C-alpha cells in the first residue's frame, strides 16, 4: 500500500492544486453590534496586516464606551501556492516600514470560547501611535499560532479529501504607556 500511495500522491496533489473551487463573491460580514461593541464608520488607525491571496477579508473598528478595537479577518477558501494561510509573505508589518516599527512579539494565553488558547502578541509603534495586536489562525475548529501544526492540519485535510479552508483572526487596540489597558479591551 505504501508504494501505491507513493505512486498516486503526486497526481493527487496536482489535482488538488488545480481543481476548480468557487471563490468569487465570498464576503465576510461582521455584525454592526455585539455585546455592547458598536461598529464605527472610520478606523482608528491606517495600519493593516499584510496577508496575500485571501479569498475574502475585512477590517472593522468597534467601540464600547472609551474602548476601541479593530478586527481583521482573512479567509482562505482553499490553500494554493501564493494563496495560503501559512506563508512567509503574510505579516503584521514589513521590516523597515516607513511609519511603523515592531517593538515586541511573543506568545500569550487568552480565553477563547471558554478555553485557554495560545495566541501571537505583537506590539507596533509609530511616532504618535502604539498598537497591541493579538492574532491566531483557525483551521477546522482548531486555533493555533504554530505554523507546523497548521501545515500538519492542512496536509491531513488533503489526505482525507476534506476542506482545507482557514482563517486568520487579528484584533488590535491602541495603547499609551504600557499595553495593559489595550489587553483588557481585546479580552472583553
Regions found by a protein language model. Give the residues of each.
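Short secondary-structure boundary micro-motifs
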Residues: 13, 21, 43-46, 106-108, ...
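Short extracytoplasmic
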Residues: 32-63
Amino acid at each position: 500500500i505504501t508504494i501505491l500511495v507513493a505512486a498516486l500522491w503526486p497526481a493527487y496533489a496536482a489535482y488538488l492544486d488545480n481543481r476548480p473551487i468557487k471563490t468569487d463573491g465570498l464576503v465576510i460580514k461582521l455584525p454592526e453590534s455585539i455585546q455592547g461593541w458598536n461598529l464605527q464608520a472610520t478606523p482608528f488607525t491606517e495600519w493593516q496586516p499584510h496577508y496575500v491571496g485571501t479569498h475574502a477579508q475585512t477590517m472593522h473598528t468597534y467601540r464600547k464606551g472609551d474602548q476601541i478595537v479593530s478586527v481583521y479577518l482573512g479567509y482562505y477558501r482553499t490553500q494554493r501556492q501564493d494563496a495560503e494561510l501559512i506563508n512567509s509573505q503574510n505579516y503584521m508589518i514589513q521590516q523597515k516600514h516607513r511609519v511603523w516599527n515592531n517593538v515586541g512579539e511573543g506568545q500569550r494565553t487568552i480565553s477563547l470560547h471558554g478555553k485557554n488558547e495560545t495566541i501571537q502578541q505583537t506590539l507596533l509603534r509609530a511616532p504618535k501611535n502604539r498598537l497591541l495586536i493579538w492574532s491566531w489562525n483557525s483551521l477546522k475548529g482548531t486555533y493555533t499560532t504554530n505554523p507546523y501544526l497548521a501545515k500538519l492540519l492542512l496536509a491531513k485535510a488533503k489526505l482525507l479529501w476534506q476542506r482545507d479552508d482557514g482563517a486568520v483572526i487579528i484584533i488590535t487596540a491602541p495603547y499609551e504607556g504600557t499595553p495593559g489597558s489595550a489587553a483588557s479591551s481585546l479580552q472583553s
